[in-house]
C-alpha cells in the first residue's frame, strides 16, 4: 500500500469485473459505489450487502477501498444515509468520498473513525476550499479538474503557509465535465435529473448552435460546443509527482473492465518508471475509450484545444486518411498502421448544403470485411456487414479505429488475470522450560468472542545433546505457512537454553494452531477484528441529536412583518428601476451581481438606505488559487452585506458585514444549513436548486424557516464552466490574454435541438454561465411556501430592461401580499415570456420525490 509520500493510483470500479481488473493491473486503491447515494447511478454498482465481501477481497490483496457517497443528501434521507455510514464502517471501508457537509457532520457523530475524502463535487479550487473541507472533517480532498499544474503548485504553497497538511487528489485520466463538478444544474433544470444526485443526462454532449447578436453563426462542422475531449495526463505524471500530489485518480465507473485494465496499467507503469513507448501507450488509452485525448486544463487554459466541437462520441486513434472510393464500396486509404479484417473503422461524412446544424453529421463506418494491402502504407478495404452508404465522403477524411478484436482479447485477458491474496501477518509467542511441554500462543490476530489461542506440545522439552532449539529453528518450522494465507510476522521466544523438541512435534503444533484459528473464524479474509454493530436505536438517537442541534433549542418565532422580496439585479439600469418603484416596501433587500468591478461602488451608492436589508454584493461562484484579487473590489465597495458563493468569500467577507449563502453552497438538509450558520454566521441560505418543492418543504420543517431564502423566479444557471465559448469560437485567441474580449462586444446564446436559445454570460474571471432560456417560476407553490413559514423570496433578473424589471417585481410582490392569486401570476408569466415559464425544480412530485434512493 502507498502512504502519503508515495503517490497512490486510484482506479474506478462500476462492477466486480472492473474492480478485479483494477487490482490485477496494480491499482493501490479502488473507488466504487453501492446502489444509492453515489454520483454514478447509471453504473451497475454494487449491492450494500456485498460491501463486506468487497472490502475483505481488496484488503486480502493489500488494496484500499473507497466508497463513493458523493451526492447531496435530502432531509428525508438522513436516516438511510446514517445506516449506510454504519454499514461502511462495519465493512472496514477505508474512506468515504463525500460531497455533503451535513453528511460529514453526521459521519463524525456516528462513525468518527471512518476517514472522509472531499469529493470533486465540493468544487474545491483554492486553499480556502481545502481548509473548509478540513474543518468539516475531511482527511483528503479531490481537487477540481479545472486547476492547472501552476495552480496546483501555488495551492501547495498556500497550504504550507496555512500550515495545513492536506493530501491532495487529482484526476489524471478520463471524461471531463465542461461544468465545474458540483455546480452543474443542467440535468436538473432541463430534465429533473440532478448531476448532484448521480443522474447526469450528459447535455454537454449534445449539439448546439451559437447565435451571436441575433444571427446564427456558421461554425462549419463544429456542433458540440460544450463537449470537451477526454483527459490524459500520462505525460504529466512526473511533474505531478514532483508537486507532491498524494493520489492520481482515473475516471470511469461507467466504463468496462478492459478500459479499467488498460488505463490502470498505463499509469501504473508510468508511476513505476517502466513505460518506454509513449505512442504505444497513447494508442492503448485511445482504444480503451476516447473522445480525443488532451491534457485538459493541466497545461493551462486553451479553450480552442479543450473543445474541438466536431464530435462527442467515442472514437479511437486516427489510423489513416481516405484517398478515394468507388461504386463497389472499396475505400483506398493511406494508413499509419496495418489494418486487419474484423477491425471497426469510422469516417465522417460531409454535411449536406443547407443541412440542419443541430443534426449530427452522418458517420460512415463498420467492420472491415475485405482488405487488400497495396504497399507503401496504402490499402483498400470494404466495410460491412451489408452494403454501406458512402454518400458524403470526402477525400482526405480521417479514418478512426473504433474497434479491434485483438486489442479486446488482449485486454480481456489482462482484466481477468488472477490476483492471489497476500499472506497476512501472524504474531506468535513460545515459552518453555526443561521437563515441561512447549507452549505456543497466538498473539495477533486475536479471536473475537473466544479465549486466547494457546496449545502445548504433547511431549516435554528435554535437554539437547546436540544443537538446541533457538529462534532460527523455531522460525523455520513455525513459519512454514505457504498456501495458508498467513505469514510469520514476529515470534517472541522465552526459552531456556539447550532444549530439544522433535521437528515433527513443532510441525504438528503449527498445523493444530491453524486448525483452531479456522474454528474460531480467523481466516485470512476475516483477520481484522469485527466492529461491534450499534443497535438501531443508537443510530436513531445520534441522528435525532444532530437534527435537534441543527434546529436549535429555541422555538421558531416568525419574522415580524409581511413576507418580502429579495431582488437580484445584474445591471445598473435594473437597480435604478427598483429605486424608482412606487412601493419600495415590497422589497426587503437587493443583491447586485455585476460583472464589472468599476460598477460596484456606484451600485452601493445608489442602493444605500433604500431597503431595510440594504444592498448586498455578490461575487463569482469560483475563486482559483491566484484570484484572491477578485474579492477586493467587493471589499472596497463597502456594501451593506454580501451574498457569498464559495469558501474564499466565506473566509474573506463574513467578518466584514452580514452575509447570506447562495445556492452554490449546496445546502440540501438541516445539518448542512446548521454547519454554515454556526461556522460562518450566515443569516440565511438559499437551498440547493436540486431540491424540488416537497424536499424544500421538508428542509423548512426540519430547521428554522427564517434561515432560508427561496428563489421564486429565475433563469436557472445550467453550466458554470471554466471553458469560455466567446474565446473558443469568436476569437483566434486561446485565453483571456489574447482573445480580444468578445464577451464585451457581443450577445451570445446557444440554441438547442428544441429551438430554445440559452443566454451565455462571462464573469470577472472569464468563466461562462449558460442560463436556461426558459425562466423558472415557483409562484404556484407560494401558498405552500408561506404556510411553511418562509418569509424571504428571491426574484432573480437576467437581461430584463427597466420596464420589465418593474413589472416583474410588482407582479410577484402582489402575489406575496395576496392581492393577485398565484395561479394568475403563473398565467401572466406564461404570456410575458416568449418561451413561457417552467416550474423546473420547484415542482411537486409527491410520494416519488426521493427518486431512486429508496428503490
Please give the residue ranges for each predicted region.
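His/Asp/Glu-rich metal-coordinating catalytic cores
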Residues: 144
Amino acid at each position: 500500500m502507498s502512504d502519503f509520500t508515495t503517490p497512490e493510483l486510484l482506479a474506478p470500479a462500476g462492477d466486480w469485473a472492473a474492480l478485479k481488473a483494477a487490482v490485477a493491473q496494480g491499482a493501490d486503491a479502488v473507488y466504487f459505489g453501492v446502489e444509492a447515494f453515489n454520483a454514478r447511478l447509471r453504473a451497475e454498482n454494487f449491492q450494500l450487502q456485498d460491501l463486506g465481501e468487497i472490502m475483505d477481497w481488496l484488503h486480502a490483496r493489500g488494496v484500499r477501498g473507497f466508497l463513493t457517497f458523493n451526492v447531496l443528501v435530502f432531509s428525508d434521507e438522513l436516516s438511510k444515509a446514517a445506516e449506510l455510514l454504519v454499514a461502511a464502517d462495519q465493512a472496514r471501508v477505508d474512506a468515504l468520498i463525500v460531497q455533503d457537509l451535513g453528511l460529514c457532520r453526521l459521519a463524525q457523530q456516528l462513525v468518527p473513525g471512518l476517514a472522509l475524502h472531499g469529493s470533486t463535487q465540493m468544487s474545491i479550487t483554492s486553499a480556502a476550499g481545502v481548509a473548509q473541507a478540513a474543518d468539516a472533517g475531511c482527511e483528503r480532498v479531490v481537487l477540481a479538474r479545472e486547476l492547472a499544474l501552476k495552480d496546483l503548485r501555488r495551492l501547495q504553497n498556500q497550504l504550507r503557509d496555512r500550515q495545513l497538511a492536506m493530501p491532495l487528489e487529482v484526476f489524471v485520466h478520463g471524461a471531463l465535465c465542461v461544468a465545474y463538478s458540483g455546480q452543474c444544474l443542467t440535468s436538473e433544470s432541463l430534465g429533473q435529473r440532478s448531476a448532484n444526485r448521480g443522474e447526469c443526462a450528459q447535455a454537454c454532449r449534445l449539439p448546439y448552435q451559437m447565435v451571436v447578436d441575433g444571427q446564427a453563426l456558421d461554425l462549419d462542422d463544429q456542433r458540440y460546443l460544450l463537449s470537451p475531449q477526454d483527459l490524459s495526463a500520462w505525460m504529466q505524471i512526473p511533474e505531478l509527482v514532483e508537486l507532491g500530489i498524494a493520489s492520481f485518480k482515473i475516471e470511469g465507473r461507467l466504463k468496462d473492465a478492459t478500459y479499467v485494465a488498460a488505463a490502470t496499467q498505463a499509469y501504473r507503469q508510468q508511476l513505476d518508471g517502466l513505460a518506454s513507448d509513449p505512442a504505444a501507450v497513447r494508442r492503448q488509452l485511445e482504444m480503451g475509450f476516447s473522445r480525443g485525448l488532451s491534457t485538459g486544463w493541466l497545461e493551462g487554459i486553451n479553450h480552442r484545444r479543450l473543445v474541438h466541437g466536431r464530435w462527442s462520441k467515442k472514437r479511437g486513434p486516427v489510423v489513416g486518411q481516405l484517398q478515394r472510393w468507388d461504386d463497389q464500396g472499396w475505400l483506398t486509404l493511406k494508413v499509419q498502421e496495418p489494418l486487419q479484417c474484423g477491425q471497426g473503422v469510422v469516417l465522417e461524412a460531409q454535411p449536406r448544403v443547407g443541412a440542419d446544424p443541430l443534426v449530427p453529421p452522418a458517420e460512415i463506418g463498420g467492420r472491415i470485411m475485405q482488405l487488400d494491402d497495396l504497399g507503401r502504407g496504402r490499402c483498400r478495404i470494404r466495410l460491412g456487414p451489408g452494403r454501406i452508404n458512402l454518400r458524403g465522403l470526402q477525400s482526405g477524411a480521417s479514418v478512426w479505429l473504433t474497434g479491434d478484436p485483438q486489442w479486446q482479447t488482449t485486454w480481456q485477458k489482462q482484466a481477468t488475470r488472477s490476483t492471489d491474496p497476500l499472506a497476512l501477518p501472524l504474531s506468535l509467542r513460545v515459552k518453555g522450560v526443561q521437563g515441561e511441554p512447549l507452549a505456543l500462543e497466538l498473539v495477533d490476530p486475536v479471536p473475537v468472542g473466544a479465549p486466547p489461542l494457546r496449545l502445548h506440545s504433547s511431549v516435554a522439552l528435554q535437554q539437547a545433546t546436540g544443537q538446541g532449539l533457538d529462534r532460527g529453528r523455531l522460525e523455520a518450522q513455525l513459519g512454514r505457512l505457504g498456501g495458508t494465507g498467513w505469514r510469520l510476522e514476529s515470534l517472541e521466544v522465552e526459552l531456556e537454553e539447550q532444549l530439544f523438541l522433535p521437528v515433527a512435534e513443532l510441525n504438528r503444533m503449527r498445523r493444530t494452531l491453524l486448525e483452531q484459528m479456522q474454528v474460531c473464524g480467523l481466516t485470512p479474509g476475516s483477520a481484522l477484528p469485527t466492529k461491534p454493530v450499534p443497535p438501531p436505536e443508537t443510530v436513531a438517537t445520534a441522528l435525532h441529536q444532530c437534527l435537534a442541534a441543527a434546529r436549535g433549542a429555541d422555538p421558531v418565532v416568525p419574522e415580524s412583518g409581511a413576507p418580502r422580496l429579495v431582488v437580484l439585479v445584474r445591471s445598473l439600469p435594473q437597480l435604478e428601476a427598483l429605486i424608482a418603484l412606487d412601493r419600495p416596501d415590497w422589497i426587503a433587500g437587493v443583491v447586485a451581481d455585476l460583472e464589472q468591478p468599476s460598477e460596484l461602488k456606484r451600485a452601493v451608492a445608489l442602493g444605500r438606505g433604500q431597503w431595510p436589508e440594504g444592498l448586498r454584493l455578490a461575487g463569482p461562484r469560483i475563486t482559483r488559487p491566484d484570484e484572491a484579487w477578485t474579492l477586493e473590489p467587493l471589499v472596497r465597495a463597502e456594501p451593506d452585506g454580501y451574498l457569498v458563493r464559495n469558501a474564499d468569500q466565506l473566509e474573506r467577507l463574513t467578518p466584514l458585514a452580514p452575509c447570506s449563502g447562495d445556492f452554490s453552497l449546496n445546502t440540501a438538509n438541516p445539518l448542512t444549513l446548521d454547519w454554515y450558520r454556526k461556522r460562518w454566521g450566515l443569516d440565511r441560505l438559499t437551498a440547493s436548486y436540486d431540491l424540488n418543492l416537497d424536499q424544500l418543504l421538508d428542509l423548512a420543517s426540519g430547521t428554522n424557516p427564517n434561515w432560508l431564502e427561496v428563489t421564486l423566479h429565475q433563469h436557472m444557471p445550467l453550466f458554470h464552466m471554466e471553458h469560455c465559448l466567446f474565446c473558443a469560437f469568436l476569437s483566434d485567441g486561446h485565453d483571456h490574454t489574447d482573445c480580444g474580449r468578445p464577451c464585451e462586444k457581443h450577445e451570445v446564446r446557444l440554441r438547442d435541438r428544441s429551438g430554445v436559445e440559452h443566454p451565455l454570460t462571462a464573469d470577472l474571471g472569464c468563466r461562462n454561465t449558460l442560463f436556461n432560456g426558459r425562466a423558472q417560476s415557483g409562484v404556484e407553490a407560494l401558498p405552500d411556501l408561506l404556510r411553511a413559514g418562509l418569509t424571504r423570496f428571491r426574484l432573480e433578473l437576467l437581461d430584463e430592461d427597466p420596464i420589465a424589471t418593474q413589472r416583474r417585481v410588482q407582479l410577484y410582490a402582489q402575489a406575496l401580499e395576496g392581492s393577485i392569486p398565484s395561479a394568475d401570476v403563473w398565467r401572466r408569466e406564461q404570456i410575458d415570456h416568449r418561451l413561457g415559464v417552467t416550474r423546473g425544480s420547484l415542482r411537486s412530485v409527491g410520494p416519488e420525490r426521493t427518486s431512486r434512493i429508496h428503490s
